[in-house]
Design a protein with these regions (language model features):
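C-terminal catalytic subdomain
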Residues: 320-329, 334-381
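Alpha/beta enzyme core
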Residues: 22, 26, 34, 38-310, ...
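Conserved phosphate/anionic-ligand binding catalytic regions in large, soluble enzymes, centered on
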Residues: 176-179, 183-185, 323-347, 425-438
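Catalytic or ion-coupling anion/metal-binding cores of large enzyme and transporter domains
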Residues: 191-218, 249-255, 355-452
Length: 452
C-alpha cells in the first residue's frame, strides 16, 4: 500500500487526530500534565511558564506514551540539554558495548540519548537501549528503512514508502521519544544545492539516503509529500519530531549557504503544520559553522521557525582538529547556548575518525556539558551559585568543598591524588608559594594602618 494522505479529506484526518492527546494538545487546552509539572520542578520555573511554552511550541517534552521515563524539557528559558549518540556501525557490531556506552553517557550527565545503529539486528539494539535508559531516547527511522532495504533489495533506492512509514511506526510503538525526520530533503532543496555547489556536498547520512532515493526514483521525498501521515504516526505516540537538517554543512567553507537556508524555510513551514496537528516539534541545526556565524544561525532559525527549540549538532567551529573535536565542539556548544540554542548533540574525540569507544563517549559528554554550562551561565539560565560556592571554597583552601562544587568531582579528586602536595592546604602547582595561602596569611589578617 502506498500512502498518499495528502489526498485524504482533511476534515476526516482532523477527526482522527482530535481524540489523541499529546503534551502540546493538552497544553493548548490548559491541561497541566505530570510531565509538565516535573519539568517545572527540576528547572525551577513556574508550572504556568511550562504550560504556556509547551502550548506555543517553544518547549517540547520528549516522552512517548509507551515508556515511563524521567521527563525532560527542551526549549527557551530552560537549561541547555545535551544529547549523546550511541549505535553500531557496519564494521563494529557489539550490542553490549553500545549499552555500556549508553550507561556511561547517562552516568556523566547526558540529558537524552539517540540510538543510531546501522549494523546488526536494529530492533534488538534499539530495544535494549530503550529498556535500560531512564532518559528520553531518539532515533533516525530512515536509517533502519534504508539498511533493511539494502539487505532485502540490494539498494537504498529500492526502499518503498511503506518501508519508511513502517520504520517510523515500529520505532514509535517501541517507545522512541523523539525522531529525526528528513522531510526537508526534497526536490526544491536538492535543486538549490546542485545549482550552488559545495566543497563537501551532503554529509547527513539520512540526507544522503533520501537524496539518492529522490534522484533515482524521480519522485518527491515521501516524508515531505506525505508529511501528514508522519504527523499522524507521531501524534499517536506523542513522539517529538526533530526535523532533520539534511542540508547542514560538512565544513565551515559551506556554512550558512543558500541550500541550508532553503531547507530552513521549508522546516519553518513544517513546524507550523506540526503544531496545528498537535505534534511537538524541534529543528536540527548546523554541524560545521564558524563561531561568528552561530548567533546569526540561531536568530534566523528562531525567526523562520517560530521560536521552535533549536538542536545544534556540535557544532564544529573549525575543521582542523580531528582527535580533539570534542574540544572544538565544546567551544561551539558554549557559543550556541549563549546565542539561544536549546539542545546540543555531543561530539567525541573519535568524530571524523572512528566509531566512538566508551572513553570517547565519556569525554564527549563531559566536554559538551561544560560548554553548555558555560553558555547557560552567560545567559543567566544558571545563576552562578555553584561557581560562587567554588570560589569561596578555593579562598578557604577547602579541598573537600571544592570537590563537592565540581561538575565532575571524581576527576578533580583523582587529579589531585595523582600528585599530592607536601602540605594539605596547597597543591603541587605552587606549594608554599600559593597566592591564596599567602593572601590569607598576610593581607587579610593585616592590621596595618597603611592598608585598611
Amino acid at each position: 500500500m502506498i500512502w498518499n494522505l495528502n489526498k485524504l479529506n482533511l476534515t476526516v484526518l482532523n477527526l482522527i487526530w482530535c481524540d489523541i492527546m499529546t503534551q502540546i494538545s493538552d497544553a493548548k487546552k490548559g491541561i497541566l500534565t505530570e510531565e509538565m509539572k516535573h519539568v517545572a520542578k527540576i528547572e525551577n520555573v513556574s508550572e504556568d511558564f511550562i504550560l504556556k511554552s509547551v502550548a506555543k511550541g517553544t518547549i517540547v517534552i520528549p516522552s512517548n506514551v509507551n515508556r515511563d521515563i524521567e521527563a525532560s524539557g527542551i526549549g527557551a528559558g530552560l537549561r541547555t540539554k545535551v544529547n549523546a549518540t550511541v549505535g553500531t556501525s557496519t564494521d563494529i557490531v557489539d550490542f553490549d558495548e553500545e549499552v555500556k556506552k549508553a550507561q556511561i553517557a547517562i552516568d556523566h550527565g547526558a540529558d537524552c540519548l539517540m540510538e543510531l545503529s546501522i549494523g546488526g539486528d536494529l530492533d534488538v539494539i534499539r530495544r535494549r537501549v530503550l529498556d535500560m535508559s531512564p532518559l528520553p531516547v531518539g532515533s533516525v527511522p530512515v536509517y533502519q528503512a534504508s539498511i533493511e532495504s539494502i539487505r532485502e533489495h540490494g539498494s537504498v533506492v529500492d526502499m518503498t514508502e511503506d518501508d519508511l512509514f513502517n520504520a517510523i511506526e515500529k520505532q514509535a510503538k517501541d517507545g522512541i521519544d523523539f525522531m529525526a525526520i528528513h522531510s526537508s530533503i526534497n526536490i526544491e532543496t536538492l535543486t538549490r544545492l546542485k545549482r550552488q555547489g559545495r566543497v563537501t556536498g551532503l554529509v547527513s547520512r539520512g540526507g544522503s539516503f533520501m537524496s539518492g532515493w529522490i534522484v533515482e526514483n524521480e519522485q518527491e521525498n515521501p516524508l515531505y509529500s506525505n508529511f501528514d501521515y508522519v504527523l499522524e504516526l507521531a501524534k499517536e505516540h506523542d513522539v517529538v519530531l526533530s526535523l532533520a537538517n539534511g542540508m547542514r554543512a560538512g565544513s565551515i567553507a559551506d556554512s550558512t549557504d543558500r541550500a541550508q537556508i532553503q531547507e530552513l524555510i521549508i522546516l519553518g513551514e513544517l513546524i507550523d503544520r506540526s503544531r496545528e496537528a498537535g505534534v511537538q516539534c524541534m529543528i536540527e541545526g548546523p554541524g560545521h559553522i564558524p563561531i561568528n556565524e552561530i548567533p546569526t544561525n540561531v536568530m534566523i532559525q528562531k525567526k523562520m521557525c517560530s521560536n521552535a527549540p533549536f538542536y545544534m549538532l556540535g557544532p564544529i567551529v573549525c575543521d582542523v582538529a580531528p582527535g580533539y573535536d570534542h574540544i572544538v565542539s565544546a567551544i561551539g556548544a558554549a557559543s550556541s547556548a549563549k546565542a539561544g540554542a536549546d539542545f546540543i548533540c555531543y561530539v567525541t574525540p573519535a568524530e571524523h575518525l572512528a566509531l566512538p569507544d566508551p572513553d570517547d563517549v565519556k569525554e564527549g559528554v563531559i566536554a559538551t556539558k561544560i560548554g553548555a554550562y558555560a553558555g547557560d551561565l552567560a545567559t543567566g539560565i544558571i545563576d552562578g551559585s555553584q561557581d560562587l560556592a567554588m570560589a569561596e571554597a578555593r579562598k578557604r583552601l577547602d579541598w573537600e568543598a571544592q570537590y563537592e562544587c565540581a561538575m565532575f568531582p571524581e576527576a578533580a579528586h583523582a587529579k589531585r591524588d595523582q600528585r599530592p602536595p607536601e602540605e594539605e592546604d596547597t597543591c603541587t602547582m605552587c606549594g608554599n608559594f600559593c597566592a591564596v595561602k599567602i593572601v590569607n596569611e598576610w593581607l587579610d589578617k593585616s592590621d596595618s594602618d597603611l592598608i585598611k
